[in-house]
A protein has these predicted regions:
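Gly/Pro-rich active-site loop or hairpin
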Residues: 63, 101-105, 111, 173-232
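Acidic/histidine-rich catalytic cores of soluble enzymes
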Residues: 125-206
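Boundary/entry segment of secreted carbohydrate-active catalytic domains
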Residues: 1-20
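C-terminal helical cap(s) of enzyme catalytic domains, especially alpha/beta-barrels
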Residues: 243-273
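Acidic-and-aromatic substrate-binding clefts and catalytic sites of carbohydrate-active enzymes
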Residues: 13-17, 29-41, 57-67, 137-145, ...
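Active-site acidic/histidine proton-transfer and metal-coordination neighborhood
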Residues: 68-162
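Hydrophobic faces of well-ordered beta-strands that scaffold small-molecule active sites
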Residues: 4-10, 25-29, 49-52, 84-86, ...
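Acidic (Asp/Glu)-rich catalytic clusters
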Residues: 18-22, 35-51, 64-82, 121-124, ...
Length: 274
C-alpha cells in the first residue's frame, strides 16, 4: 500500500478531535501503547494505521530483544498495519534504560550492528519495515560519516524504507549550524515511506524536538520547499503532550496541508472555523 495525504499520530488524549477529522488518510500509533485489543476510537476511524515503535533500540550493540519484535509483529497484525517503523537510535545499553532516543555513533561499526538488528526486526515482521532519522542533541567524537551517508548505507544494506522526519532534519541542521535544505537533500529520498513533522523549541541555545510545541515557521517552509518540486509524500503530525485546544490543533493541521499542497482534513468538525 502506498500512503498518501495528511495523517496524524493517534493519541488517546486527542482521540475525540481525531474522530471528527474529515478522513485523515492514515494514522500512526505507538506500538508499546497497544495491548491485546484495538482501542475502539482508533478502530472506528477506518483508516490505515501504522505501527510505530520507540523501544526496539535498533542502534544498540546488543541484539534486539525477540519479545519486542514479537510484540511489534502482533500489534501490526492486530491493527492491520500496512507498515511498521522504528527509530535509528538506541534506548538501552548494558541493561540500563536511557528513557529517550539516543543518537548512534555514525561509524561503520555502528552500521554493522544496525544492519544486524534491522534485518532481524524486518524478518520478524509480517509487514514492510521503515526506519526514522532522529533529532540528536549531540554528536559522537568518533563519527566517520555524515548523516546522509549513514542513513543511505543502512537503507541500501537492509532494503528497508525511510520515515523522513522533516522536523528532525531541521533540528539537526540548526544545532550543527548547517543548512537544512542541503542536509535534507543528502538523505535517501527515493526510499521515503512517509514523513513526520512536529514542533519544537530552543532551550539553552539548542533546538529540541519536543512534540509539545507548535511547528516553527522554518520547518513549514522546509516542507513547502521539499514538496514544491512535485513530491507528494504522505505527511503526519506528531504531538505527544501539552495538547493545545482543538482549534489550535486544527489550525496546525491546516498549516501542514497548505505548506505541502495537500487537501485539508479539518472541515465540518464542531470546532472548525466557518
Amino acid at each position: 500500500m502506498t500512503l498518501h495525504g495528511l495523517g496524524i499520530g493517534w493519541r488517546p488524549e486527542i482521540s475525540g478531535i481525531i474522530a471528527q477529522l474529515n478522513k485523515p488518510t492514515f494514522c500512526e500509533v505507538i506500538a508499546e501503547s497497544i495491548g491485546d485489543s484495538v482501542p475502539p476510537q482508533l478502530a472506528a476511524l477506518g483508516v490505515p494505521v501504522i505501527t510505530h515503535g520507540i523501544s526496539l533500540s535498533l542502534g544498540g550493540a546488543e541484539p534486539v530483544q525477540q519479545s519486542r519484535i514479537d510484540h511489534m509483529a502482533r500489534t501490526a497484525t492486530l491493527l492491520g498495519s500496512p507498515l511498521a517503523s522504528e527509530h535509528i537510535a538506541f534506548v538501552r545499553a548494558g541493561g540500563l534504560e536511557a528513557g529517550h532516543l539516543l543518537p548512534v555513533p555514525r561509524t561503520y561499526e555502528s552500521i554493522d550492528a544496525l544492519v544486524r538488528n534491522i534485518t532481524r526486526t524486518r524478518d520478524g515482521l509480517p509487514v514492510p519495515f521503515a526506519v526514522e532519522n532522529i533529532a540528536a542533541l549531540f554528536d559522537w567524537p568518533d563519527d566517520e560519516l555524515t548523516e546522509g551517508e549513514f542513513l543511505a548505507e543502512i537503507i541500501e544494506r537492509t532494503g528497508v524504507l525511510l520515515v523522513l522526519d522533516i522536523a528532525n532534519v531541521y533540528a539537526n541542521a540548526l544545532n550543527r549550524r548547517l543548512d537544512p535544505w542541503t542536509e535534507l537533500n543528502r538523505l535517501p529520498l527515493d526510499r521515503i515511506a512517509y514523513c513526520h513533522i512536529a514542533g519544537g523549541s530552543i532551550h539553552d541555545g539548542m533546538y529540541h524536538d519536543t512534540h509539545t510545541d507548535p511547528i516553527p515557521e522554518p520547518v513549514l517552509e522546509l516542507l513547502t520547499r521539499f514538496t514544491a518540486g512535485g513530491r507528494r509524500p504522505a505527511i503526519m503530525l506528531e504531538r505527544d503532550g501539552n495538547y493545545p485546544p482543538a482549534l489550535e490543533l486544527l489550525d496546525e493541521l491546516d498549516a501542514i496541508a497548505d505548506a505541502a499542497g495537500l487537501d485539508r482534513i479539518t472541515a465540518d468538525t464542531v470546532w472548525s472555523r466557518p
